[in-house]
């Protein structure tokens, strides 16, 4: 998100940071603050910029856990705009593995993109979730797009690949494992989606 949106190609670490929303700007600020401590105080810092994560224990406001848990409960899946916003998806286990790899082999003060090379539109992700759960696509409900919603994120991860890291999990297998986890752990996410979460959900999606 710190790079902003890109129509074609992929962002490299040296590209300008052009966040489109206060949320992404806060990430950009944290990125640069960490670097400033490296430059000023020689604090051992390595900066990583990762694509969209997914996996077990992800808070259910995020797209994949929200849509999986809604589908399990036969609730509507609120898709922003036309659903064609594209994201690159990175399984959380691979993200953790990449961070551990960079702690050992990364260069202090450097920036590394971490992506899964799994670019899909939000609508594609929605279809995959519904298909894996054998749920009807009639559960999809298109809602007004959110403000500052970037169209496409894409990362060039050549830098970390050249060091020797690449993701181990295929997207389809990782999504299957994630869906299975949420299916088996309603005792964790069920209470989270009650109470204040319902108020947030209604205000966010107007459904």
Language-model regions: role of each:
Residues 1-47, 52-54, 58-60:
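Catalytic helix-loop patch of NAD(P)-dependent Rossmann-fold dehydrogenases
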Residues 29, 33, 37, 67, ...:
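Hydrophobic alpha-helix immediately C-terminal to the catalytic Tyr-X-X-X-Lys motif of short-chain
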Residues 65, 71-207:
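C-terminal substrate-binding subdomain of Rossmann-fold SDR/epimerase-dehydratase oxidoreductases
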